[in-house]
Amino acid sequence: MAFLAASHPLFLMISESVNIIIITLAIFLGIIGIIGCVLPVIPGPPISWVGMLILYIWGHGTNSSGEPMSTRLLIIWCVITAVVTVLDYLVPSYLTKKSGGSVYASRGALAGLLIGLLFFGPLGIVLGPMLGAFLCEIIFARKSAGESIVPALGAFAGFLCGTGLKLIASGMMMYYIFVYIR
């Protein structure tokens, strides 16, 4: 009595089912990663990178020429993911401070993003950080409305830069997920 050989029809059927699950999971993680670039509670680029990692680990990472995904590509995208994730935390606060904002503007931008997303959807994601920074500068830093506009715009620019970097990174990783699906 022998175990299933690799050429046995049942083995091939199970193998094909696993392939479909792995590929679906990688694509799903890539999509969640892109969504996570805009939603502050989901770490977008790391989730996209895990999608690439899954293809690599299970050996499904081959492009249309039959070349496998290289370890080098995976490491490069791991480093890019780490850098983009760190920059996403540093850039908004840096631009807020460079524009004369206080720590309240940075916190207000994050609070505005969360509240804006919750109550106003996509428009809240865009306008929430700016409005949150503006209001927190007025209320907590006790600045005038005129003095609060520039830091609010700085917080908004920081949010856009961080989100843009994450979208580019996750979008490129999604591209590689599709390239390396065989």
Predicted region positions:
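Short, strongly hydrophobic alpha-helical membrane anchors
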Residues: 1-21
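C-terminal binding/interaction regions
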Residues: 141-182
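Alpha-helical transmembrane segments of multi-pass membrane proteins
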Residues: 29, 33, 80-89, 117, ...
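Helix-adjacent hinge/juxtasegments
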Residues: 70-116
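Juxtamembrane interface at the ends
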Residues: 92-98, 129-143
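Interfacial segments of multi-pass membrane proteins
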Residues: 48-66, 111-117, 131-140
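Transmembrane alpha-helix interface/packing and boundary motifs in multi-pass membrane proteins
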Residues: 30-49, 113-124
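Short hydrophobic alpha-helical membrane-embedded segments
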Residues: 19-29, 99-111, 147-152
